[in-house]
């Protein structure tokens, strides 16, 4: 875990911030989702899957790319 000089888990803080933004944005950017996927630790995956599942469930026509992201996380 990368920590700054004060013991802060920078990776964890960035992941948490990105997860909040992805959850609150109606259509989160692919760049933001790519970055969070690069930074995810195994413990972070269930929260991210939950966020994506909520988006797919509430969208009348879920995007193909969002569905592909979910499927990629299951393999």
Describe the function of each predicted region.
Residues 1-2, 75:
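Absolute protein N-terminus
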Residues 2-39, 61, 68:
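N-terminal acidic leader/helix
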Residues 14-16, 45-53:
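Amphipathic alpha-helical scaffolding segments comprising HEAT/armadillo-like alpha-solenoid repeats
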Residues 36, 45-48, 64:
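Solenoid-repeat scaffolds in large eukaryotic assemblies
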Residues 55-60:
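Solenoid-like repeat scaffolds
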Residues 66-75:
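Long, compositionally biased
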